[in-house]
Curated annotation (Swiss-Prot):
Key words of the record: Host cytoplasm, Host nucleus, Virion, Virion tegument
Protein's recorded name: Tegument protein UL47 homolog
Name of the encoding gene: sORF1
Lineage: Viruses, Duplodnaviria, Heunggongvirae, Peploviricota, Herviviricetes
PTM (free text): Phosphorylated by US3. This phosphorylation is required for proper nuclear localization.
Pfam families recorded: Herpes_UL47
UniProt record, GO biological process: regulation of DNA-templated transcription
């Protein structure tokens, strides 16, 4: 929510040390300036009973295998014990896999008139980035009028200049969509080819997540054995090679699914469809679903959900570009952008965790159906069969800390980040609620539901989850490139959590069938070209301490959803590592990024 030229609020807190965090104490809201709660480090969480039971994985709710009690006797992958039915090579697991992997029939064929209607609906949305939310290959983009080429940057301020936001939206569209606009003209992809790509990408992503569980099992077993021995045992920190094995959220449901297992010699980042059409879609970035032909075939519910995600991220991407210089000049030694970078880094870590949570929920839902199929009760309705990712206790604990920290920062970018996060996190929950309601209605019909009928419901949910994951993956790459460029080229010193970088590195691998990450070199070159072509030159200006906001600025207001999520800090124990200087964190994890800050990646052509 934004208001023009509202009266300014006082800056609630300035964080000068990395070890301090704004939070809620003793279950009651305290004045923001009095908040002094340190980051809860993983090494300092003690022997909390819930965490000892694997609270961050929530095995009781998800009915998964407890990672802290993993022994050969109850490990289905270390013995011949079968769970949830017989999962032989030709058993129900393979049968289920064949149905899931069969060509989806959930995207309708549409004509140009329906596409034009969808494009008009999308672009008619009132937004502070209008009219630059248009599809860059459409008529409305080609007829755009002139705009300010000299936006003003207010570093780490409570307001953003309206023109700077529009320029940011323009640059974001050009940088992130130009390649797909050109590739689309050359390859002319169709709705059917897009559906086939999404179907194959979904199954490959499930293979990646499932196989990662198995490949990390030896590390998890070693950590579990060390814990049981009790001798000088400490929980792994994000710098430990075993940390991700313990801290990832992917659970198997105690079954062997041959169709989901990758050969041991196949790296998960190479499990991607090849060919020119797949390369176009994998390299499309945000443009894939900004393209109206990709949204028009969706059903009405999915159209609304996808539009909501695109609108929210359009504003945030524009706000990010409007908050920092387009060309860093490190010799100036300007540190006034570091507070806004601190906010972006905190949001980045939270958004990475949310994306991993949603991907884990999609894997969980897929395996849940397979397990019920093997047990022969797939046509029995169970309200808790498909877990809501928004009710993940690990996520809610971290939300309380991170959103409270963003809310206390007092910068416009922090508010936009918090509002965008609150909007994005509820969308997969809506899709899951719809799946559960439709599943219940299908099982109450007079006729017995067929396996294909119920799989169709799961496919509809999987379609939206896949779209959501694709857009979030491209957004996280965008945020990562902005942060890396600020630390490396801008010499900005701001804190970031190492755990966020490790999780993001793994997410890039897991989601490689959907998205090819953009290297920093490609990102910087595209941004430089867009700014040069439009002759954009920014000016940095401080906000004067008066009773009025500068003319032409926008003040964003925290949404009610953000305030509700902040209260989760009181209910759940957050598990977080201490932030560290960003430049050192990127150097530590850079090898895991495949050197992507130095050079490009294989674009999958």
């Amino acid at each position: 929510m934004a208001t023009d030229n509202a009266r300014p609020r006082s800056r609630s807190l300035r964080r000068k040390s990395m070890g301090a965090e704004a939070a809620l104490r003793d279950g009651a809201a305290q004045p923001a300036a009095a908040h002094k709660t340190k980051v809860i480090a993983r090494s300092e969480t003690g022997d909390d009973a819930d965490e000892d039971a694997g609270a961050d994985r929530d095995p009781g709710t998800r009915r998964g295998i407890d990672p802290w009690k993993l022994e050969p006797a109850n490990d289905p992958f270390a013995s011949n014990k079968e769970y949830g039915g017989k999962w032989g090579a030709n058993g129900p697991a393979d049968s289920a896999a064949k149905v899931l992997a069969a060509a989806w029939d959930i995207m309708a064929l549409v004509d140009a008139e329906e596409v034009a209607k969808e494009q008009e609906t999308f672009e008619a949305k009132t937004s502070p980035v209008s009219p630059f939310g248009a599809w860059p290959g459409g008529q409305s983009w080609r007829t755009l009028g002139d705009y300010s080429h000299a936006p003003i940057l207010y570093p780490s301020a409570e307001v953003i200049e309206a023109d700077a936001l529009k320029v940011g939206a323009y640059v974001s569209r050009v940088v992130q969509c130009s390649r797909f606009v050109a590739d689309k003209k050359a390859q002319r992809p169709t709705v059917r080819s897009l559906q086939s790509f999404l179907e194959a990408a979904f199954w490959r992503v499930m293979q990646n997540a499932y196989s990662t569980c198995l490949r990390l099992r030896p590390k998890l077993t070693a950590v579990s054995r060390s814990r049981r021995s009790g001798a000088n045992w400490r929980k792994p920190s994000p710098s430990d090679p075993n940390w991700y094995a313990v801290s990832n959220q992917f659970l198997w449901r105690g079954m062997r699914v041959p169709s989901l297992l990758l050969p041991p010699d196949v790296p998960i980042e190479e499990n991607a469809e090849r060919g020119p059409t797949a390369a176009v879609f994998r390299n499309a970035g945000p443009a894939l679903f900004i393209w109206p032909w990709a949204r028009a075939p969706l059903d009405e519910r999915d159209k609304r959900l996808v539009r909501a995600a695109l609108w929210a991220l359009d504003i945030l991407d524009a706000a990010i570009l409007a908050s920092f210089p387009y060309a860093w000049r490190p010799h100036v030694g300007d540190k006034q952008f570091e507070e806004a970078l601190d906010c972006l880094a905190e949001y980045f870590g939270l958004a990475v965790l949310l994306t991993e949570t949603v991907l884990a929920a999609l894997l969980d839902h897929t395996l849940a159906f397979m397990k019920s199929l093997g047990a022969g009760n797939y046509d029995d309705f169970e309200e808790d069969r498909f877990a809501d990712p928004g009710k993940n206790k690990y996520l809610m604990g971290v939300e309380g800390v991170s959103l409270t920290r963003l809310n206390s920062a007092g910068t416009a970018l922090a508010t936009v980040c918090a509002n965008t996060y609150a909007a994005l996190r509820c969308l997969p929950s809506v899709a899951t609620s719809s799946l559960t309601a439709n599943y219940s209605a299908e099982t109450r019909r007079a006729r017995k539901p067929t396996r294909e009928d119920l799989f169709s419901l799961l496919q509809h949910e999987a379609l939206f989850y896949t779209i959501w994951l694709q857009r979030m993956a491209t957004h996280l790459d965008f945020c990562s490139n902005v942060l890396v460029e600020s630390a490396k080229k801008g010499k900005q010193e701001f804190p970031i959590r190492r755990s966020a970088l490790v999780r993001h590195m793994w997410l890039q691998k897991l989601l490689s069938p959907l998205v090819v990450p953009v290297s920093l070199r490609d990102f910087a070159a595209a941004k430089k070209e867009a700014v040069a072509d439009a002759k954009i030159e920014t000016y940095v200006k401080s906000v004067q301490s008066t009773n009025k906001d500068p003319k032409g600025t926008i003040r964003f207001i925290a949404s009610d959803n953000v305030k509700t999520l902040m209260a989760s800090y009181e209910k759940y124990n957050p598990i977080l590592d201490e932030p560290m200087i960003a430049s050192r964190a990127f150097d530590d994890v850079i090898s895991g990024y495949g050197g992507r800050t130095a050079g490009g990646q294989n674009r999958g052509d």
